[in-house]
């Protein structure tokens, strides 16, 4: 790690004439200014401007604690008749005075284990304000970090006699908007992020909420104006604003609730089964609340605030075993309804250890059988893939969902037609790793009971990565997917996996907040509406032009692109869904939807029909030295160029919405004086996601850093370009400049 640090600590004593004075913090480039003060009621307030434009109007900060429990000892007695005194103890939002302020500047460059660039700069100015509340004799710290691309702040609770153990009733962090901005939003929900995005004015959210809430396997929407982070907005005066959080550890996931009369968002935490929102023990802190802002949409995509606000890697040897993975899997045929996760249709109830599958009749549709898996292994080996995922391999799928069943899977017992040892031997001979699947059916207590045994089973049978799932309502019953208890579980699973040198791809878990910096074996997350929904009726055409501005702000997504046969009835006649994308855009998603874990999600037979287009999936890199955001507008288009790790090869991808998009590309990011062979995979002139999704063109030619190229993406279309350095002049023979 390269470091360049400048620390300047300036302590201001709590002198009466400056105690509640206004404090200003500027970004290193002076474009952002954050102003903090305590108002006349002793409430902490802040505001934020960017190039003299208001980003956050004056907004208050603080928390509300739960009333103290009625059960007490003689050592902790409070007079029950003194209700004023009792209620005041729940107040951590006013009655404060400034006790101390400290400022600092920090500048370092660090290297991620994997990522969108080789090095990341972490440069900010900091203000830490210690606030004292005389009526309760307690202190808190609000720490602000102002980067060139945005602001992060969090609450810190020092250990003290008057604040040791406490329960959070609600966090009241406000984000006051300066207008009725355009928002790219999904409904606030304690249990799912798998919604299509709605584009509307803030004032329209209430009226559109009912339509925006579509059915899901587990969902708990909480308000007519509640939305989830990361929330993307665009102002009428040309600012792009993103609200999210970073380093979500031992705390509840934050949503936002909008006061649509005053255009003020306020934090809304996910409750536990009792309705409480956080059990805390000092010293402790909240996650960071983040505000990314720019007058250029590309800078939202380029921001690394979320990663920079997380702690450095805690796995000492991570670089030796955490590696990007390109994989295929026994999955899409089941998603479309052609195949089945379950082994038999005869059982309506399964009891693990008691149900005898040898006495049942196979349904003939079970996809995770040895012969079929070997076929996938052969395909992966022939085309340079790293791994094969197999879902539905283990006993219990016949009654796995919707029964609030505790002991649902044991994660080690295969179905009769899945030979674990033979598949391990076969894959090893072919140089292919197997990817484990741990669907928990949201029975988290059961998963934790079996976790060590399940991870050891993986280690014994050649699995070094796992796709985990949490479909359904959480057990223990009443807990939510995004509450403090579950967030602690997700991190426990990742840390435990690291003990076995296992990489984790968590589905249905809390949306990422940059924790992959600290634990890079968290190599993938779903936490949004992915490709599977294309088989359940389809995603909105603009979906992939929004996700990088929202969900991917927190970390990579296992979006599972690469569907070439977009008509699902070709797989299953009963499924009339259509993937809302052209083939060219499916290729582009390997560049625009960043992840070190990339799946070629279609079945082998569909790739064999389009091997020329499939070549891009085979070629595209997973790990990057450099990323350039060439053009971007949320809801319309995104074009990204990435330089492959330790090479001078580049890959470009463009995804477009319903209006299509024409790019005027300039390749000045290429090395001067070098020639490159470019292979351009583009929509044909008559391509259209609905009418002609498989129409594409492929052309080769020479590029230099002075080249320019116009390319058109169709409705729901895109394009992809592989750009490889010419190392021998003979490689370019016969090719013309593009």
From Swiss-Prot:
Q: What is its EC number?
A: 3.2.1.3
What does the record give as its pathway? Glycan degradation; starch degradation
Effect of altering residue 532 to Q?
A: Abolishes enzyme activity
Gene Ontology biological process terms in this record: starch catabolic process
**Chain positions of site Substrate:** 194, 331, 467
> Can you tell me which family this protein belongs to?
Belongs to the glycosyl hydrolase 97 family.
* Name the record gives this protein: Glucan 1,4-alpha-glucosidase SusB
Organism expressing this protein natively? Bacteroides thetaiotaomicron (strain ATCC 29148 / DSM 2079 / JCM 5827 / CCUG 10774 / NCTC 10582 / VPI-5482 / E50)
């Amino acid at each position: 790690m390269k470091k360049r640090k400048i620390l300047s600590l300036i302590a201001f004593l709590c002198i009466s004439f400056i105690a509640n004075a206004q404090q200003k913090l500027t970004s290193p480039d002076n474009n952002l200014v954050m102003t903090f003060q305590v108002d006349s009621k002793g409430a902490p307030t802040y505001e934020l401007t960017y190039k003299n434009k208001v980003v956050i109007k004056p907004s208050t900060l603080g928390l509300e604690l739960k009333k103290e429990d009625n059960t007490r000892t003689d050592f902790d007695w409070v007079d029950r008749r003194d209700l004023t005194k009792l209620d005041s103890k729940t107040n951590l939002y006013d009655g404060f005075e400034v006790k101390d302020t400290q400022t600092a500047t920090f500048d370092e460059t660090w290297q991620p284990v994997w990522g969108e660039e080789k090095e990341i700069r972490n440069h900010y100015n900091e203000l830490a304000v210690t606030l004292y509340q005389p009526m309760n004799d307690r202190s808190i710290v609000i720490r602000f970090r102002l980067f060139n691309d945005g602001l992060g702040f969090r609450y810190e609770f020092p250990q003290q006699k008057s604040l040791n153990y406490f329960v959070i009733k609600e966090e009241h962090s406000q984000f006051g908007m300066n207008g009725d901005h355009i928002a790219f939003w999904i409904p606030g929900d304690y249990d799912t992020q798998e919604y299509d995005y709605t584009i509307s004015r803030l004032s329209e959210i209430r009226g559109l909420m009912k339509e925006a809430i579509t059915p899901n396997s587990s969902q708990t929407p909480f308000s007519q104006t509640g939305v989830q982070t990361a929330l993307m907005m665009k102002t009428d005066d040309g600012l792009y604003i993103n609200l999210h959080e970073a380093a979500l550890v031992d705390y509840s996931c934050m949503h936002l609730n909008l006061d649509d009369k005053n255009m003020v968002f306020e934090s809304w935490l996910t409750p536990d089964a009792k309705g409480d929102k956080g059990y805390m023990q000092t010293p402790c802190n909240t996650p960071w609340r983040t505000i990314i802002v720019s007058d250029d949409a590309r800078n939202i995509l380029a921001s690394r605030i979320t990663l920079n606000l997380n702690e450095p890697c805690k796995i000492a040897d991570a670089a030796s075993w955490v590696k990007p993975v390109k994989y295929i899997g026994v999955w899409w045929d089941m998603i479309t309804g052609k195949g089945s996760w379950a082994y038999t249709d005869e059982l309506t109830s399964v009891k693990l250890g008691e149900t005898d599958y040898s006495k049942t009749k196979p349904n003939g549709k079970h996809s995770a059988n040895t012969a079929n898996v070997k076929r996938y292994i052969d395909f992966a080996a022939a085309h340079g893939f790293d791994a094969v995922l197999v879902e539905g391999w283990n006993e219990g799928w016949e009654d796995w969902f919707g029964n609030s069943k505790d002991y649902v899977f044991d994660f080690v017992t295969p179905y009769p037609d899945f030979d674990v040892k033979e598949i391990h031997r076969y894959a090893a001979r072919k140089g292919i790793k197997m990817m484990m699947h741990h669907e928990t059916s949201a029975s988290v207590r059961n998963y934790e009971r079996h976790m060590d045994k399940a991870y050891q089973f993986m280690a014994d049978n050649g699995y070094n990565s796992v796709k985990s799932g949490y479909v359904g309502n959480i057990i223990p019953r009443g807990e939510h997917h995004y509450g403090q208890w579950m967030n602690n579980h997700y991190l426990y699973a990742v840390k435990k996996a690291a003990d076995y040198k296992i990489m984790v791809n968590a589905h249905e878990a809390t949306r990422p907040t940059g924790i992959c910096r600290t634990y890079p074996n968290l190599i993938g997350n779903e936490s949004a509406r992915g490709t599977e929904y294309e088989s359940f009726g389809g995603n909105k055409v603009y979906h992939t032009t929004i996700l990088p501005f929202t969900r991917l702000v927190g970390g990579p997504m296992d979006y599972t692109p690469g569907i070439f046969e977009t008509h699902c009835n070709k797989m299953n006649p009963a499924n009339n869904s259509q993937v809302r994308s052209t083939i060219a855009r499916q290729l582009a998603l390997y560049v625009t939807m960043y992840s070190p874990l990339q799946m070629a999600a279609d079945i082998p037979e569909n790739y064999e029909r389009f091997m020329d287009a499939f070549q891009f999936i085979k070629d595209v890199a997973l790990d990057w030295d450099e990323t350039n955001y060439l053009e971007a507008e949320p809801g319309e288009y995104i074009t990204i160029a990435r330089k492959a790790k330790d090479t001078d090869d580049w890959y470009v991808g463009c995804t477009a919405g319903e209006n299509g998009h024409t790019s005027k590309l300039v390749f000045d990011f290429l090395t001067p004086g070098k020639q490159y062979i470019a292979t351009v995979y583009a929509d044909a002139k008559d391509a259209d996601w609905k009418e002609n999704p498989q129409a594409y063109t492929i052309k080769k030619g020479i590029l230099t850093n002075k080249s320019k190229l116009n390319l058109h993406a169709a409705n729901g279309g895109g394009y992809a370009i592989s750009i490889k350095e010419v190392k021998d002049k003979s490689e370019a023979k016969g090719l013309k400049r593009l």
